[in-house]
Regions:
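Gly/Ser/Thr-rich loops at beta-strand to alpha-helix junctions
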Residues: 1-10, 34
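Short helix-capping segments at alpha-helix termini
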Residues: 19-22, 47-49
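Conserved phosphate- and dinucleotide-binding cores of soluble alpha/beta proteins
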Residues: 29-185
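Histidine-anchored nucleotide/phosphate-binding helix
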Residues: 7-20, 95
Length: 185
């Protein structure tokens, strides 16, 4: 499996699988620019004895092409009524690659992240993050020329069409089923 981001939701499910005797192997993307995957997810999984291999974000396609990934799992910040999600920048690209290689993508999120008033990802605001996160943050010296413009959005929108299922505390939903929750609330 391949992890992309730092969400606690999927980690809980991995811990539970391990407790039930499954021995998951997790490829953990570094998750730039803040390196949450390297600093947090890999740390947490290693701490409880899960087999973790840290990878650069750009290695996902290579892993999938080589048949090393059974599924991708991510958390998310927000889910729109149509099943689009907002999550850490790079999630959309990861999901596009996964679809190409026929690797399922699961979003692990509590139902509290569902915003039924938000029709689609087009209605979500995307925060711009500071340039230093890309140019300076984890480097002894700045790694980019002084004054270079930086594009650093915090999240991107992954369309529902790229998502296999949304794992909530109430079970697994297809993205198209999110809209129906309104009728049941």
């Amino acid at each position: 499996m391949l992890s992309y981001d730092k969400s606690a939701q999927p980690l809980g499910h991995i811990y539970k699988a391990q407790q039930q005797g499954y021995l998951p192997r997790v490829y953990c993307d570094e998750t730039r620019p803040l390196l949450e995957g390297a600093r947090l997810t890999a740390y947490e999984l290693t701490r409880v004895g899960i087999d973790v291999t840290l990878t650069c974000d750009n290695m996902a396609a290579s892993l999938m092409a080589g048949g090393k990934i059974d599924f991708v799992f991510v958390g998310c910040d927000r889910i729109a009524a149509n099943g689009d999600i907002a999550n850490k920048i790079g999630t959309n690209g990861m999901a596009i690659i996964a679809k190409y290689y026929k690797v399922p993508v699961y979003v692990f999120a509590p139902t509290s992240t569902i915003d039924l008033d938000c029709k689609s990802g087009d209605d979500m605001d995307i925060e711009d993050r500071p340039a230093f996160e890309v140019t300076d943050m984890y480097y002894a010296k700045p790694m980019a020329p002084k004054g270079v413009r930086v594009y650093n959005p915090a999240v991107d929108i992954t369309p529902a069409s790229l998502i296999t299922g949304i794992v909530t505390e109430n079970g697994i939903l297809k993205p198209r089923e999110i809209r129906n929750l309104k009728k049941n609330r």
